[in-house]
C-alpha cells in the first residue's frame, strides 16, 4: 500500500509526492522554492494584517530596555 501523499507544487502546480527525502518540499524543485522565496522577499506575497509603524517598535523596545535595567 502506498501511503505517500500527493501534493501540487504551490508555484508551478506540478504534481509531486510528499517525501522526507525531498529537500524542496512542498515545492517540486529548487527553482520553485527560490521563486517563492523571491516573492516573499519582494513582498509580492504577504500575510494579511495591519501595517506596523517602525517608530512604534523602536519606542516599545526602548521602554522594555528601561524596564530591564531597573
Swiss-Prot record:
Residues 43-70 are annotated as: Disordered. GO terms for biological process: regulation of DNA-templated transcription. Transmembrane segments: none annotated. Keywords: Metal-binding, Zinc. It holds the Pfam family YacG. Binds 1 zinc ion. Its cofactor is Zn(2+). GO terms for molecular function: DNA topoisomerase type II (double strand cut, ATP-hydrolyzing) inhibitor activity; zinc ion binding. Gene3D superfamilies: Erythroid Transcription Factor GATA-1, subunit A. Zn(2+) binds at residues 9, 12, 28, 32. Inhibits all the catalytic activities of DNA gyrase by preventing its interaction with DNA. Acts by binding directly to the C-terminal domain of GyrB, which probably disrupts DNA binding by the gyrase. PANTHER family: DNA GYRASE INHIBITOR YACG (PTHR36150:SF1). Belongs to the DNA gyrase inhibitor YacG family. Interacts with GyrB. This is DNA gyrase inhibitor YacG. It comes from Legionella pneumophila (strain Lens). The gene is yacG.
Amino acid at each position: 500500500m502506498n501511503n505517500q501523499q500527493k501534493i501540487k507544487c504551490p508555484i508551478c502546480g506540478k504534481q509531486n509526492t510528499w517525501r522526507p527525502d525531498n529537500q524542496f518540499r512542498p515545492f517540486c524543485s529548487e527553482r520553485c522554492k527560490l521563486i517563492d522565496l523571491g516573492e516573499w522577499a519582494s513582498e509580492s506575497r504577504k500575510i494579511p494584517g495591519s501595517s506596523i509603524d517602525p517608530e512604534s517598535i523602536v519606542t516599545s523596545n526602548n521602554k522594555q530596555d528601561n524596564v530591564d535595567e531597573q
